[in-house]
């Protein structure tokens, strides 16, 4: 009885595989040469033409200056961020990279959080965001 079930299961899997891969999606169906030629010529005409423009030195310098301004403004914006006030440390807390298995108290660093791996068998406090 087990052999017949095994054979039937194998046959069922083979039939499912065969039916799934024997029918290609509509865009992959084979076509005759005439339709391929007509489609390829139409596709080439559908796309807009590409124009190549040479940049002179002045435009290159302007773009460099604009890029430097953007970089400096981003640096200034990141430096202007106000540091959020840190909560006072509670006496029982776990240091960064130490074990913080669930009955343990919270992490000492306010930017750190307890991350568990391997089905909560190995947990440690880790700092996730560098901007904190």
From Swiss-Prot:
<dbReference type="Pfam" id="PF05039">
    <property type="entry name" value="Agouti"/>
</dbReference>
<dbReference type="InterPro" id="IPR036836">
    <property type="entry name" value="Agouti_dom_sf"/>
</dbReference>
<feature type="disulfide bond">
    <location>
        <begin position="111"/>
        <end position="132"/>
    </location>
</feature>
<feature type="compositionally biased region" description="Basic and acidic residues">
    <location>
        <begin position="63"/>
        <end position="79"/>
    </location>
</feature>
<keyword id="KW-0964">Secreted</keyword>
<feature type="region of interest" description="Disordered">
    <location>
        <begin position="62"/>
        <end position="88"/>
    </location>
</feature>
<dbReference type="GO" id="GO:0031779">
    <property type="term" value="F:melanocortin receptor binding"/>
</dbReference>
<feature type="disulfide bond">
    <location>
        <begin position="116"/>
        <end position="123"/>
    </location>
</feature>
<feature type="disulfide bond">
    <location>
        <begin position="93"/>
        <end position="108"/>
    </location>
</feature>
<feature type="signal peptide">
    <location>
        <begin position="1"/>
        <end position="22"/>
    </location>
</feature>
<dbReference type="GO" id="GO:0042438">
    <property type="term" value="P:melanin biosynthetic process"/>
</dbReference>
<feature type="domain" description="Agouti">
    <location>
        <begin position="93"/>
        <end position="132"/>
    </location>
</feature>
<dbReference type="InterPro" id="IPR027300">
    <property type="entry name" value="Agouti_dom"/>
</dbReference>
<dbReference type="GO" id="GO:0009755">
    <property type="term" value="P:hormone-mediated signaling pathway"/>
</dbReference>
<feature type="disulfide bond">
    <location>
        <begin position="100"/>
        <end position="114"/>
    </location>
</feature>
<protein>
    <recommendedName>
        <fullName>Agouti-signaling protein</fullName>
    </recommendedName>
</protein>
<feature type="disulfide bond">
    <location>
        <begin position="107"/>
        <end position="125"/>
    </location>
</feature>
<keyword id="KW-0960">Knottin</keyword>
<dbReference type="GO" id="GO:0032438">
    <property type="term" value="P:melanosome organization"/>
</dbReference>
<comment type="function">
    <text>Involved in the regulation of melanogenesis. The binding of ASP to MC1R precludes alpha-MSH initiated signaling and thus blocks production of cAMP, leading to a down-regulation of eumelanogenesis (brown/black pigment) and thus increasing synthesis of pheomelanin (yellow/red pigment).</text>
</comment>
<dbReference type="GO" id="GO:0005615">
    <property type="term" value="C:extracellular space"/>
</dbReference>
<dbReference type="InterPro" id="IPR007733">
    <property type="entry name" value="Agouti"/>
</dbReference>
<dbReference type="GO" id="GO:0005184">
    <property type="term" value="F:neuropeptide hormone activity"/>
</dbReference>
<feature type="glycosylation site" description="N-linked (GlcNAc...) asparagine">
    <location>
        <position position="39"/>
    </location>
</feature>
<keyword id="KW-0732">Signal</keyword>
<keyword id="KW-1015">Disulfide bond</keyword>
<keyword id="KW-0325">Glycoprotein</keyword>
């Amino acid at each position: 009885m087990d052999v017949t079930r095994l054979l039937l299961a194998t046959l069922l899997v083979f039939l499912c595989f065969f039916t799934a891969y024997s029918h290609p999606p509509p865009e992959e169906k084979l076509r005759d040469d005439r339709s391929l030629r007509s489609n390829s010529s139409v596709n080439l005409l559908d796309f807009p033409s590409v124009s190549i423009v040479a940049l002179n030195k002045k435009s290159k310098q302007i773009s460099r200056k604009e890029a430097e301004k953007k970089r400096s403004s981003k640096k200034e914006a990141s430096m202007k961020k106000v540091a959020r006030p840190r909560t006072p440390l509670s006496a029982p807390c776990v240091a960064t990279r130490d074990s913080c298995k669930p009955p343990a108290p919270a992490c000492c660093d306010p930017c750190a959080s307890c991350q568990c791996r391997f089905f909560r068998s190995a947990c440690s406090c880790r700092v996730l965001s560098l901007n904190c």
